[in-house]
Amino acid sequence: LKCNRLIPPFWKTCPEGKNLCYKMTMRLAPKVPVKRGCIDVCPKSSLLIKYMCCNTNKCN
């Protein structure tokens, strides 16, 4: 699986066991990603932070 880094077009190949790409954004600025990368379990979103997870190449 390949996931985008914080600044596209850079990306990285995920290590074994981390089979989701994720993007973390602040709810007040949803178009500005704070973090991107590979993860094993999608974290729950909160009042301030929103997580978007997916399982295809460079979908974050």
Curated annotation (Swiss-Prot):
Q: Which UniProt keywords apply?
A: Cardiotoxin, Cytolysis, Disulfide bond, Membrane, Secreted, Target cell membrane, Target membrane, Toxin
**Major localization class:** secreted
Give the highest taxon in the source lineage. Eukaryota
Its source organism is Naja mossambica (Mozambique spitting cobra)
Give me the disulphide-bonded residues: 3-21, 14-38, 42-53, 54-59
Keyword Disulfide bond applies = yes
- Which BP terms from GO are recorded? killing of cells of another organism
Which Gene Ontology cellular component terms are annotated?
Answer: extracellular region; membrane; other organism cell membrane
InterPro entries on file: Cytotoxin_Cobra, Snake_3FTx, Snake_toxin-like_sf, Snake_toxin_con_site, Toxin_cobra-type
The record's account of tissue expression is: Expressed by the venom gland.
Give the protein family. Answer: Belongs to the three-finger toxin family. Short-chain subfamily. Type IA cytotoxin sub-subfamily.
One Pfam family, short name: Toxin_cobra-type
Q: How does it assemble?
A: Monomer in solution; Homodimer and oligomer in the presence of negatively charged lipids forming a pore with a size ranging between 20 and 30 Angstroms.
| Biological role stated in the UniProt entry | Shows cytolytic activity on many different cells by forming pore in lipid membranes. In vivo, increases heart rate or kills the animal by cardiac arrest. In addition, it binds to heparin with high affinity, interacts with Kv channel-interacting protein 1 (KCNIP1) in a calcium-independent manner, and binds to integrin alpha-V/beta-3 (ITGAV/ITGB3) with moderate affinity.
Q: What is this protein called?
A: Cytotoxin 3
**Cell compartments where the protein resides:** Secreted; Target cell membrane
Record GO terms (molecular function): toxin activity
**SUPFAM superfamilies, per database record:** Snake toxin-like
